[in-house]
Every structure is written in structure tokens, then in C-alpha cells.
Amino acid sequence: GQPKAPSVFPLAPCCGDTPSSTVTLGCLVKGYLPEPVTVTWNSGTLTNGVRTFPSVRQSSGLYSLSSVVSVTSSSQPVTCNVAHPATNTKVDKTVAPSTCSKPTCPPPELLGGPSVFIFPPKPKDTLMISRTPEVTCVVVDVSQDDPEVQFTWYINNEQVRTARPPLREQQFNSTIRVVSTLPITHQDWLRGKEFKCKVHNKALPAPIEKTISKARGQPLEPKVYTMGPPREELSSRSVSLTCMINGFYPSDISVEWEKNGKAEDNYKTTPAVLDSDGSYFLYNKLSVPTSEWQRGDVFTCSVMHEALHNHYTQKSISRSPGK
């Protein structure tokens, strides 16, 4: 066959495999023809601890051999020098013990830096005097390199200093989420004042500002209707009571159920849906055991909305006798 030059591969132990003070490094000389090859280490200056194994003829007819050397694990990298006279080839390969370092995740590429979101108070909080409405400003994708975030709050463009201390949360993707909460008065929200959160962070070229206020427009009073379960449902273990709420504006509304003055929790509310006339409607479905409905328990749908008298109304429903 034609003479063929060898390929040379460095051999080094994996990181963590060698707690001992000596480490074995090697070179694999593969796929050459004809014999022989010579292997020296550090141009022949390193002879101590060298073992060069006999060549092996592979099924392809080409030859391979390996040479190893034992060195102290702290020593400099070593070089194997491979010569193949038949093809006039000389190859030098440097082999180094791999150093162990604790693997670290690369920091996520936070392109564009942090983002800011502002959230309105919960409708129930703005409508009940006993509760405190809050506007919330959330900053996400804050990097660990620039973790400091400053919040400045404004009501109708006048700075206020009544925000709670910011809360910081380390996220799983090694970014930080920072939340600032501003307690506000019921009146400031209901009268449509504008709340602004201004966020400073080193990773931002300029501060980010987000504003929020109640939807503008004439408030419209919700109409509330309750409906019992369809007859076909009475054979199931539980039945659905429906509270339909129609014609309200703005869309901020709170809907809950109770039975005998105690809260019922097993309900779901659809989001408020924009109707063709510009008002909103929604449905709320309460699931109750059929037995409670059949024995005549009274269920009450309670609605809170700013256009209602005292911000509150309720509608009750129970099984009428004979059904």
C-alpha cells in the first residue's frame, strides 16, 4: 500500500480523575504505513517514566501505537515528538493535565437589560374602605452585575416617598426580580389620578417610566342576574350556579359567592369581555354539591364596582319549591 502519515492525538486524564500527585499523559499515533514511527518526549530530554507500547496492525492494514509518560501533576505541559521516516512526517503534540475548576454557568445574555411592568390595584381593594389599594412596579431581568434598582414614584407628576421598601427575588435563571409597592388612597385611584413608576439601573441607558391610571370614561352600573342549574345537570354530583354581570364600565370588578354569610370558594370568573356597546360583561360559575341545592340552601352572588351605590350589590338564588 501507499505510505501513509500518522494522525497524532494527545491523551490526558479527565478533570477530577487524578487525586494522586502523579499523572499519566500520552500520545496516540494512529493510521500510519509502513512501520516504523519514533516517539520522543520534550525532544528527547524527558526519558524518565516513558513507556512506548508495541505497534498494532489494524484491520485496515494501517498501524497504530501509543506512548505514555508519568509526570507530577503540578508539572509543565509535555510535548510528544512523532517522526514517520517513510512519509518524512514530524508532528509535535503538547499534552497538559486538565485543571479542575468548578463548572460555572455562563451569565444569561441580558440583551436590552431590565424590563419594567406596572400593575393596578385589585378592584376589591379600591372599593372597600377597610382595605389598602396598592400600585405595583415590577422590574425583571436585573443582572447580578448591576443589581441596584432605584424606584421613584409620582402621583400626577408629583414625587411621593410613601412606597414600601423594594422586595428582591433571585430567579432560577440567575436574574433578579425587584418589586416596589406604593400604597395609595381609594380616592386617588377612583378620581383617575395618574401613577408613575420611574426605574433607574446601571444596565439601563436611561430610566424607564411606566404609568397607570383608572380607565377614563363615564362609569356604568353593572346589572346582576343569577341563574340556577340547567335541569339536565341535577342528576350529577354537583351543579353550576351562574352569576351574569352586564353593562358595566370600567372593567374593574370583584365577584364572589357566599352561602349563609360564609364565603364559597369553588367558583371561577371569566375575564371581563368588551361588549359591542363599549360596556363589559362577565360570567361567574359557582359549583356546589347537588344535595345543597336540592335542600334549598340560599346562595348569594356579591358584586363590587365603583358605579354601584355604596360600591356593592348582591343577588341571591335558591331552588324554588316544586322544581
UniProtKB/Swiss-Prot annotation:
Q: Does the keyword S-adenosyl-L-methionine apply?
A: no
Instruction: Tell me which Gene3D superfamilies the record gives.
Output: Immunoglobulins (2.60.40.10)
Q: Which GO terms describe its molecular function?
A: immunoglobulin receptor binding
Pfam families cross-referenced by the UniProt entry: C1-set
- On whether Repeat is a keyword of this UniProt record, the answer is yes
Q: Which UniProt keywords apply?
A: Immunoglobulin domain, Repeat
Domain Ig-like: from-to ranges? 6-96, 114-213, 222-318
Q: Reported effect of changing T185A?
A: In E15 marker
- Superkingdom field: Eukaryota
**Cited CDD domains:** IgC1_CH3_IgAGD_CH4_IgAEM
More details: PubMed:6313520 sequence has the D12 allotypic marker, 104-Thr, and the E14 marker, 185-Thr. PubMed:6193512 has the D11 and E15 markers and Ref.5 the E15 marker.
Q: What name goes with this protein?
A: Ig gamma chain C region
Q: Which organism is it from?
A: Oryctolagus cuniculus
